[in-house]
Amino acid sequence: MSLRYVYGQDETVRFVAQLIPHVDRGFPADHLSIGVIDASGRMVAGIVYYFWNKKNGTIEIAAAALPGVRWFTRETIRRALDFAFTQCRCQMVIMRVRGEDERLLYQLARFGCSFIALPRLYGRDTDGVMCLLTDDAYAAHPASSPKIREAA
């Protein structure tokens, strides 16, 4: 499988916002992004970084993909998290996830994320989970780049 990555394109931000139901107003103006393009040139996934707090070293991310597309590869994960931890120099990545998305929560747990349950985050009947990944937890994971492991 051949994937290509594009950085900083507004098309990626629109793509991600359209695929996530709770992003009804888009993302803040000071966002960053990585788009994932397949061999035919079609955008199949995207990652948006927003609410970057440089002082505290935190950044929030949102990711979305077309259904049935294999995009969450080791290389994509490495690029996404190295961007946050190396380029942005963050010490923590934060992702909000619907409580019923057990598959994604399972994947994030395997990466070493810690979780905070947030009742009603997505409305009266829909809970959310704040998923927190520190640079130390990522550095301990085999998918991290050598740069991240050396810095930890």
Predicted regions span which residues?
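Conserved glycine-rich acetyl-CoA-binding loop
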Residues: 66-78
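Conserved catalytic-core motifs of GNAT/GCN5-like acyltransferases
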Residues: 96, 114-129
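A conserved beta-strand-loop-helix scaffold within acyl/acetyltransferase catalytic domains
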Residues: 26-30, 39, 44-56
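Conserved acetyl-CoA binding element of GNAT-fold acetyltransferases
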Residues: 55-68, 96
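Conserved active-site alpha-helix within GNAT-family acetyltransferase domains
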Residues: 100-117
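Short amphipathic alpha-helix that is part of the acyltransferase structural core
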Residues: 1-24
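Conserved GNAT acetyl-CoA-binding A-motif
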Residues: 86-97
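C-terminal "cap" of GNAT-fold acetyltransferases
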Residues: 122-152
